[in-house]
Amino acid sequence: MKILVSNDDGIFAEGIRSLANGLAAVGHEVFVVCPDKERSATGHGLTLHQPIRAEIVKSIFDDRITAWACSGTPADCVKLALFSLLETQPDLVLAGINHGPNLGTDIFYSGTVSAAMEGIVENIPSIAFSLGSYTSREFEVAVNFAQSLVQKIESQPLDNLMLLNVNIPAVKETEIAGVKITRQGVCRYIDIFKKRVDPRGKTYYWLAGELLEETEETKDQAIPDKYNTDVEAMREKYITITPLQYNLTYGRQLTYLQKWKIDNFSYN
């Protein structure tokens, strides 16, 4: 398969090197377009008010891989690859392997998930891979699973356009509890901002915060609760696969809102 790989940790991150090299090793045609520096938590931002530069990078990846380092965001990287750098469209867009999990509502901030989301915006099935640790450099389990999942999709293509958000526990292979199909959970934080004072007496804020245990979800969910959330399944050391889509319409509430009789609203 022809595969485009990106990330938000940057061109020098071990996660993307492990993923790209692992896929090339089993015969896939791999292209890498990723940020030239750390771009974590940039969400789906695009660069609009300055030029985007992309340079071919050698010696970082397997010789079979063509790679570019891009000055833009993760979403920029995928968009630039699809419309300017690659001669033909890839079969899959992959993002990762991220250094740290992307679970629950944190996915809205994730540059990794957003890079993969840009793939399905352009009608290409996508996968985001994340390792459940910010410090671990053991990517072998994650790479092995990525190889297996890509092989599965190659032999049995997804029946609908979707993004698979995959999180792998940062534990030994023997400690993995299994693989679960999950729904998106909820992550909440306390003490989100630290208020500090600089040497000149000016107040500034540093985004910090402590993750709470998974909190209660919004009621009246359309998704069956027989599926574990990604947050709880990862806590139990399962590899999680959560299908995502870019359409955020709350479908079940369309009929309810129609009862508002909005024709009677004033707008002048």
UniProtKB/Swiss-Prot annotation:
<feature type="binding site">
    <location>
        <position position="9"/>
    </location>
    <ligand>
        <name>a divalent metal cation</name>
    </ligand>
</feature>
<dbReference type="InterPro" id="IPR036523">
    <property type="entry name" value="SurE-like_sf"/>
</dbReference>
<dbReference type="Pfam" id="PF01975">
    <property type="entry name" value="SurE"/>
</dbReference>
<feature type="binding site">
    <location>
        <position position="8"/>
    </location>
    <ligand>
        <name>a divalent metal cation</name>
    </ligand>
</feature>
<dbReference type="GO" id="GO:0008253">
    <property type="term" value="F:5'-nucleotidase activity"/>
</dbReference>
<dbReference type="GO" id="GO:0000166">
    <property type="term" value="F:nucleotide binding"/>
</dbReference>
<protein>
    <recommendedName>
        <fullName>5'-nucleotidase SurE</fullName>
        <ecNumber>3.1.3.5</ecNumber>
    </recommendedName>
</protein>
<keyword id="KW-0963">Cytoplasm</keyword>
<dbReference type="GO" id="GO:0004309">
    <property type="term" value="F:exopolyphosphatase activity"/>
</dbReference>
<dbReference type="InterPro" id="IPR030048">
    <property type="entry name" value="SurE"/>
</dbReference>
<keyword id="KW-0547">Nucleotide-binding</keyword>
<feature type="binding site">
    <location>
        <position position="40"/>
    </location>
    <ligand>
        <name>a divalent metal cation</name>
    </ligand>
</feature>
<dbReference type="GO" id="GO:0046872">
    <property type="term" value="F:metal ion binding"/>
</dbReference>
<dbReference type="GO" id="GO:0008254">
    <property type="term" value="F:3'-nucleotidase activity"/>
</dbReference>
<keyword id="KW-0479">Metal-binding</keyword>
<comment type="function">
    <text>Nucleotidase that shows phosphatase activity on nucleoside 5'-monophosphates.</text>
</comment>
<comment type="similarity">
    <text>Belongs to the SurE nucleotidase family.</text>
</comment>
<feature type="binding site">
    <location>
        <position position="98"/>
    </location>
    <ligand>
        <name>a divalent metal cation</name>
    </ligand>
</feature>
<dbReference type="InterPro" id="IPR002828">
    <property type="entry name" value="SurE-like_Pase/nucleotidase"/>
</dbReference>
<keyword id="KW-0378">Hydrolase</keyword>
<dbReference type="GO" id="GO:0005737">
    <property type="term" value="C:cytoplasm"/>
</dbReference>
